[in-house]
Amino acid sequence: MNQQMIKTIITEVPSKLTILWQSGKQTIVDISEYINSPGYEKLKEPKFFTSAIVEEWGHGVEWADGEVGIDADSLYRLGKEQAGLAFPVTDFNAWMERNRLSLASAANALGITRRTVVYYHGGHKPIPIYIKLACIGWETLAYQQAA
């Protein structure tokens, strides 16, 4: 996957960013989960939230003081998840935990590389819907075999 690059952004208080990507595509991303996380508390202030700018070279979004920011790949992944075009990382990690799978065993179960599982597990790349389907299928078969 190529690194995503941001061209412009528009903020919408309290938590939405409309992102125009260098590719010409547009995404609306709700960053509520960031705003409610430690280190991002300043984003709750409307004036601070609307001070967002595109980082140099389009690698992310940063706010007025330069100490708060979100990288482009995370925004891209989050936008895909919110649009229903990617399997949410929280659901993928819950599947791994529920089935007591390590990174290597999850990779083996899904027929993908361990490195890919690391990217998915850490939220570094959007997780394709077919991986969600594979997780559901694997879990269904595992339950049937256990019965």
Where are these regions (language model features)?
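Motif-centric detector for short Cys/His coordination patterns
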Residues: M1-A147
